[in-house]
């Protein structure tokens, strides 16, 4: 039985969405159990609508919940030992749950998770990994906003963790990995990116196949399974892609309804447009994973619908079911055992210069 703790107060439309998402998941995952955390007078009436969850869940009332506008430090100070988010995370720490899912404030979720669960001994810093729809299938992109800036060693950590997540979700023995850069040539990019590329080429880590540098336009193509970058550029890439998807949808909707002929064309092509809409639907690939922590924590989009929240729960389930933490820990340990040797062998002349 895989136990999922759920902060049912975090999202824009919670607790309805979180509980409805759990009800969807239980239809196709038989060995799952939920621990719901939230304000009793708000959550109990919603739970009554879903009797299918009665035998596979337990509700725990909390004093408060974390608001979307709270700063991480404020949320941690106010929510520790009180909020639904804190208790959902603490359940993982105490071994009462195997994974935590929340649609709440990202900064607060990261701060509470970091404070409560601590880091894996082998990881230098956390990262948020997101599932990205591509022309080929799906890719994983990380870090998409946990921290700003990263050293070469930290970028390699992200590569190892991202590859582990891809293996857990898609059962690919050796996912392909690329470092996001301003060009594919080895001489281009910042020092830390070039240094990380050198390490990944030399170390030949088990469980991933390093393909070199990739550019921004390679993300949507699905050129590699895992795209690695630091949180600043990763978050910009994510927000740009989301904005572009909305822009395309609005332009198409306006164009297809501009005249009788275009409306007729839309009617005749509606199946193709439905396929396009489903492919670009963020709820289909909802569920960012907070990697590097000593526990599995999943971040759902705050605006996700029930199907989207169900997707986030499924991601958490797969992470646990496939032993993500043990595999990542072993992979990181192998890298760090050889790290000093690799750094000593670094060719400073070849790696010099930080200009584009």
From Swiss-Prot:
GO terms for molecular function: phosphate:acyl-[acyl carrier protein] acyltransferase activity. The keyword Hydrolase does not apply. It comes from the Bacteria. It is an enzyme of class 2 (transferase). It is found in: Cytoplasm. Its EC number is 2.3.1.274. GO terms for cellular component: cytoplasm. Gene3D superfamilies: Isopropylmalate Dehydrogenase (3.40.718.10). Pathway: Lipid metabolism; phospholipid metabolism. InterPro entries: FA_synthesis, Phospholipid_synth_PlsX-like. GO terms for biological process: fatty acid biosynthetic process; phospholipid biosynthetic process. Keywords: Cytoplasm, Lipid biosynthesis, Lipid metabolism, Phospholipid biosynthesis, Phospholipid metabolism, Transferase. It catalyses: a fatty acyl-[ACP] + phosphate = an acyl phosphate + holo-[ACP]. Belongs to the PlsX family. Homodimer. Probably interacts with PlsY. PANTHER family: FATTY ACID/PHOSPHOLIPID SYNTHESIS PROTEIN PLSX (PTHR30100), PHOSPHATE ACYLTRANSFERASE (PTHR30100:SF1). Catalyzes the reversible formation of acyl-phosphate (acyl-PO(4)) from acyl-[acyl-carrier-protein] (acyl-ACP). This enzyme utilizes acyl-ACP as fatty acyl donor, but not acyl-CoA. This is Phosphate acyltransferase. It comes from Bartonella tribocorum (strain CIP 105476 / IBS 506).
